[in-house]
Amino acid sequence: MLLLKAKRSFEGYVLISPEGNGIEGIAFVPATNGAAAGSFYLVNQSDELGGPDPSIVFEVEINHAASGPEARIVRYFSVGVTDLSGIHYDASSGRLLIISDSNEALLVVSLTGDVLESYPLPGKKQEGITIDGNGSLYIAQDAKEALLKLIQK
């Protein structure tokens, strides 16, 4: 097992507070230019849109240096809602699917951070999101119904 550590700040701005809620979701996006393996997109669960420890999405690249691999934050963006709790990369559309627990919303977001679509979600306490091989969307919940199947393409 390899443990990668990333700094909690980017260009002097604190993105992840040690006392905060922390990272809730991670998705891998393969590189299209062949220069790197790809990037990880992570969501930080927070009740704040600004200030230290904001509710944001950030992109992390892995640098395979001679001294060992290092995780490096390369950029971040806000999607305008708090309490981000899950993220999935939809390779068929090239978009990120992001859920917000307290807002009970599904956001469709470009890799540059533009919110393209927003949908209300049924249920409560959505925590995880994925798409199966048939294009059906599943959301895990910390509620009575543990798994929701929402959309079939």
What are the language-model segments listed below?
Residues 1-153:
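Sequence/structural signature of beta-propeller domains
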